[in-house]
Amino acid sequence: RYDTQLLIEGENLDEDVINEYFTENFKGDCLLAVGDEELIKIHFHTNEPWKVLEYCRTLGEIYDIVVEDMDRQARGLHG
């Protein structure tokens, strides 16, 4: 339901490890975790965006956070 996007800035980030953690621990789809050892972009559709943010915060600084309600978007509403 929620389109969750953010950037993680840190050290020794590993997109494969992040992908695996998401797959094993979060319900959702459309996962994209790309970047390098210092910056990873996350895109994920989930009903529990707060869990995604909590985990990502353990990896480094998170910013450019966007959480959009796709149900509202589908009905033509904003937010």
What are these regions (language model features)?
Residues R1-G79:
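N-terminal loops that bind phosphate or other acidic moieties
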